[in-house]
Amino acid sequence: LQLQQLQEQNESNRTMLECWTVLSSLVPLTRRIKLGAILVNLFRNPAIVAKMASTLDNISNGRLEFGLSAGWYQKEAEAYGAPFPSGSARVEMLKESVMILRKMLYSDNNNVNNKSNISFKGKYYNISNAECNPKAVQKPHNPRMALHFTPR
């Protein structure tokens, strides 16, 4: 087994555990497999996702891979109280999220205390002096991020 990957979207009635919690529980039980998550961008603030990704990448010694989906399953978004804007707006939200994630996970803007504080002002997301320290273990641009755009 090379990669254990979990997703958030569930359009069936099967049991599906929350992916970040499950992946965290696998860290001490495994040593080599990559740990992957496919996240719905609508469900979490990208600054929080960056902090979660950095944490999991650090405690797993660089084994995290994750993907982001613009979101396509309206019923699920509504069930969790998440917004479900038009397809083009979801894609724009995803683009802003990727900009924030890249800045927070990989930037080298270190201040006097060797910490990176990131600010971003966009149409959908605004963060001010958000910290993501320590940075992701993997270099140069990992954990790997895959994007998922949908036609809906």
Predicted regions and their residues:
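Active-site-adjacent structural elements that line small-molecule/cofactor binding pockets in enzymes
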Residues: 1-152
